[in-house]
């Protein structure tokens, strides 16, 4: 989880890198903090996308993930049929 303190440290290291440069330890810390931030961002985005519901023309609701899974299954079946 990325906290406000983590974001402050990321920004602090960024500004220091522009002003005077970073030590090897600080570069490693910056790299790790950025990786953690990107991971948390992606997990959050995925969670938001998976919670979206799509309303079908018939009025029924379906999860985006379920719709995607159905589409991938259908495409795989079509490709398998073409391969035979």
Swiss-Prot record:
Entry keywords, A to Z: Cytoplasm
Highest taxon of the lineage: Bacteria
Subcellular location: Cytoplasm
Cellular component GO terms held in the UniProt record: cytoplasm
Record-linked Pfam families: DUF896
Family: Belongs to the UPF0291 family.
Protein name: UPF0291 protein EUBELI_00985
């Amino acid at each position: 989880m990325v906290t406000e303190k983590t974001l402050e440290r990321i920004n602090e290291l960024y500004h220091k890198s522009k002003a005077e440069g970073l030590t090897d330890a600080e570069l490693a810390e910056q790299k790790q903090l950025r990786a953690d931030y990107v991971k948390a961002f992606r997990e959050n985005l995925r969670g938001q996308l998976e919670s979206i519901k799509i309303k079908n023309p018939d009025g029924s609701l379906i999860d985006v993930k379920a719709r995607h899974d159905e589409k991938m299954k259908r495409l795989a079946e079509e490709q398998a049929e073409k391969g035979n």
